[in-house]
């Protein structure tokens, strides 16, 4: 049985919606708040919320270093909105004391779309997701200013990069979990499934 166990970092943000989307994409989904829970999952989703708050809570719960270690070790990880910011190697406009987990060689701008439009929906063509374009919900969303050579741009909107993949790390500016379209989560579940060693099956 090749059903991956995927955690959702449950420190802040729309955790429940991600749990539902992952289950719909044929994964076993569970909340992760502590290092011992992180150790038990095959992959992790970092949900939207407020990136500064997530950073502070990750430190408070003793999660920041275990998260960095697992991501460096190749654990598949998917970040949406604030989660995208957490996976960036660099933030263009960080708040004081704000730290990231890193994992994707990209520079992000926090709340970039929010300056123009607090929240909106838009269709986005995402590389690797078949069929119709994905309906993306952007809520005070970041965008990616630039990516390094190792990072692959999967989608753009309005001339800005909104989805990126580097190895086992995936990030989107938008919230696919809020639309009922679970294809982006399906892409991530496939990434997790492909990463699992035969011994772990």
Swiss-Prot record:
Q: Which molecular function GO terms apply here?
A: glutaminase activity; pyridoxal 5'-phosphate synthase (glutamine hydrolysing) activity
Catalytic function, reaction form: aldehydo-D-ribose 5-phosphate + D-glyceraldehyde 3-phosphate + L-glutamine = pyridoxal 5'-phosphate + L-glutamate + phosphate + 3 H2O + H(+); L-glutamine + H2O = L-glutamate + NH4(+)
Record has Hydrolase as a keyword: yes
Q: Report the GO terms under cellular component.
A: cytosol; glutaminase complex
Q: State its role.
A: Catalyzes the hydrolysis of glutamine to glutamate and ammonia as part of the biosynthesis of pyridoxal 5'-phosphate. The resulting ammonia molecule is channeled to the active site of PdxS.
Instruction: Give the multimer and partner information.
Output: In the presence of PdxS, forms a dodecamer of heterodimers. Only shows activity in the heterodimer.
Q: Which family does it belong to?
A: Belongs to the glutaminase PdxT/SNO family.
Protein name according to UniProt = Pyridoxal 5'-phosphate synthase subunit PdxT
Q: Name the species this protein comes from.
A: Streptomyces avermitilis (strain ATCC 31267 / DSM 46492 / JCM 5070 / NBRC 14893 / NCIMB 12804 / NRRL 8165 / MA-4680)
Task: Give the gene name.
Answer: pdxT
């Amino acid at each position: 049985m090749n059903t991956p166990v995927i955690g959702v970092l449950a420190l802040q943000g729309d955790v429940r919606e991600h749990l539902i989307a992952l289950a719909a994409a044929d994964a076993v989904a569970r909340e992760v708040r502590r290092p011992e829970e992180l150790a038990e999952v095959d992959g992790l989703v970092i949900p939207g919320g407020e990136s500064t708050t997530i950073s502070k809570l990750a430190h408070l719960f003793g999660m920041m270093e275990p998260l960095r270690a697992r991501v460096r070790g190749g654990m598949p990880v998917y970040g949406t909105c604030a989660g995208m910011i957490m996976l960036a190697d660099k933030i263009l406009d960080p708040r004081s004391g704000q730290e990231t987990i890193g994992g994707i060689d990209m520079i992000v701008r926090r709340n970039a779309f929010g300056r123009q439009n607090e929240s909106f929906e838009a269709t986005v063509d995402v590389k690797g997701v078949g069929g119709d374009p994905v309906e993306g919900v952007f809520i005070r969303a970041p965008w990616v200013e630039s990516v390094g050579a190792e990072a692959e741009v999967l989608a753009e909107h309005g001339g800005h990069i909104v989805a990126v993949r580097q190895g086992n790390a995936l990030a989107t500016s938008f919230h696919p979990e809020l639309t009922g379209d679970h294809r982006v989560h399906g892409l991530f579940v496939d990434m997790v499934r492909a990463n699992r060693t035969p011994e772990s099956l």
